[in-house]
Amino acid sequence: MLVRMIYVSRSVNPDSGSPTDSILASSREHNLSNGITGILCYGGGIYLQALEGGRNQVNALYHQIANDERHRDVVILLYEEIKERRFGGWTMGQVNLTRLNTSIVLKYSETHDLDPYAVSGSVSLALLEELMATASIIGRG
């Protein structure tokens, strides 16, 4: 059974350069061998990530993320059974949230500063789908 999970978290050390590099490298290797696909967005010390794959694999990965010392305030925004993947082309795509077009952000947010903690899971999914459709994903992985 395929599932999709979207979660948000804060970086424990947001000023340490680009924490996504090590996360992306390990994600792509792990995800490929476990049939997990998705997108990782990072900016302003916040991670927003969509994961798709088998229920057991996604659940196990989420538990790793929730216990990862690089993350805090981990919150699941969306968890659903799916018929097909929306992010199947990426073992882990990447989006820099600080470089988003303001008009895209305002479409899904109350202000020009995107706060994934303040929006629903369905809004987060719509944002991620738009980023995919507008080629805002900078790393295909």
Feature map (PLM): residue ranges:
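Charge-rich, low-complexity N-terminal segments
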Residues: 1-141
